[in-house]
Design a protein with these regions (language model features):
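ER/secretory pathway lumenal C-terminal domains and tails of membrane proteins involved
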Residues: 8-11, 32-37, 70
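Short glycine-rich His-centered loop
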Residues: 18, 22-33, 41-56
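General detector of N-terminal leader/presequence modules that precede the first folded domain
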Residues: 46-48, 54, 59-73, 120-125, ...
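Low-complexity, highly charged intrinsically disordered N-terminal segments
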Residues: 48-53, 57-70, 74-81, 86-94, ...
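Short boundary motifs at domain starts and secondary-structure transition points
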Residues: 33-43, 106-108, 204
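Helix-enriched interaction subdomains in cytosolic or periplasmic regions
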Residues: 1-25, 75
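Glycine-rich beta-alpha loop elements in corrinoid/cobalamin-binding modules
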Residues: 85-211
Length: 211
């Protein structure tokens, strides 16, 4: 959430690739599926990561994730990539080699994006969310985050009672996310174009006022 457009971060696949031979089901980390979307970084004013806090095999079939992925990428001025929880074998290797949580499409660090949207379908995803934030290098507590960190928001069934994770998120979206994701993208874009008035707290106040 820096005041200037984020510089394009480098992908991590060259560092990640040697580790994949040492893990189970490495194909889940490669990406490149049919209909995957990867827009040039400079073509987007708002960069999203849509994360399902479980493994690829559990999260990829989720219809809500697929819908939001399509909606955001159809905006033209915003883009969305996906991220999933990694299995313990790869997590251990990533931590040992200093590699952070990454996106599936470009393998860029999750922390380099503007918005991290997490779909919490069950309470079991809450601990995976915290683990992913830690692996990404994003401060766990929302009041410790700076302009260099993404906005962390949750949606899905568990968002109707956000209190268990209230200290760790910036925004909870209640109900269907199709319209909300567009409005959130517009707010973040307009706030940035205006020079980021009020800093991180400024955009959070605008988001809170939307109800």
């Amino acid at each position: 959430m820096s005041e200037q457009p984020r510089p394009e971060p480098a992908g991590l696949f060259d560092e990640l690739s040697p580790l994949l031979a040492q893990v189970v089901t490495p194909v889940q980390y490669v990406g490149g599926e049919i209909n995957a979307r990867l827009r040039p970084w400079g073509d987007s004013q708002v960069h999203w990561v849509l994360m399902y806090p479980d493994t690829y095999g559990v999260g990829q079939p989720n219809q809500g994730l697929a819908i939001l992925y399509e909606v955001i990428n159809e905006l033209g001025w915003a883009s969305a990539e996906r991220s999933f929880s990694v299995w313990p074998d790869l997590e251990a290797l990533m931590r040992a080699h200093g590699l952070p949580q990454f996106t599936l499409e470009s393998h860029r660090p999750v922390r380099a994006y503007d918005v991290l949207g997490v779909g919490l379908s069950t309470e079991l995803g809450c601990t995976n969310l915290l683990n992913a934030l830690d692996l990404a290098g994003v401060p766990l507590h929302s009041d410790e985050r700076t302009m260099d960190d993404p906005l962390v928001l949750i949606g899905g069934h568990c968002a109707f009672n956000p209190e268990p994770v209230a200290d760790f998120i910036d925004v909870a979206v209640l109900g269907d996310g199709e319209e909300a994701s567009v409005e959130l993208s517009r707010i973040v874009r307009d706030w940035r174009l205006a020079g980021c008035p009020g800093g991180r707290d400024g955009v959070l106040e605008v988001l809170a006022a939307t109800g």
